[in-house]
């Protein structure tokens, strides 16, 4: 059990870039929807 707790920072460091990107995902989907509407012609 203690070894698992000791290894947590290593595991977390792998996912740290992913956690940095997470807040930008809704913005990305908003831009994707905007580009899709622009390509359709704002029907």
From Swiss-Prot:
Q: What is its main location?
A: plastid
- Signal peptide span per the entry? none
Membrane topology term:
Single-pass membrane protein
What are the annotated GO cellular component locations?
chloroplast thylakoid membrane; photosystem II reaction center
Q: Which keywords fit this entry according to its UniProt record?
A: Chloroplast, Membrane, Photosynthesis, Photosystem II, Plastid, Reaction center, Thylakoid, Transmembrane, Transmembrane helix
**Positions of transmembrane segments:** 14-34
Q: Which residues form the propeptide?
A: 1-6
Places the protein is found: Plastid, Chloroplast thylakoid membrane
GO annotation, biological process = photosynthesis
Instruction: Describe the task this protein carries out.
Output: One of the components of the core complex of photosystem II (PSII). PSII is a light-driven water:plastoquinone oxidoreductase that uses light energy to abstract electrons from H(2)O, generating O(2) and a proton gradient subsequently used for ATP formation. It consists of a core antenna complex that captures photons, and an electron transfer chain that converts photonic excitation into a charge separation.
Oligomeric state and interaction partners are given as: PSII is composed of 1 copy each of membrane proteins PsbA, PsbB, PsbC, PsbD, PsbE, PsbF, PsbH, PsbI, PsbJ, PsbK, PsbL, PsbM, PsbT, PsbY, PsbZ, Psb30/Ycf12, at least 3 peripheral proteins of the oxygen-evolving complex and a large number of cofactors. It forms dimeric complexes.
Q: Which family does it belong to?
A: Belongs to the PsbK family.
| PANTHER family in the cross-refs | PHOTOSYSTEM II REACTION CENTER PROTEIN K (PTHR35325:SF1), PTHR35325
This protein's name: Photosystem II reaction center protein K
Which source organism does the UniProt entry give? Bigelowiella natans
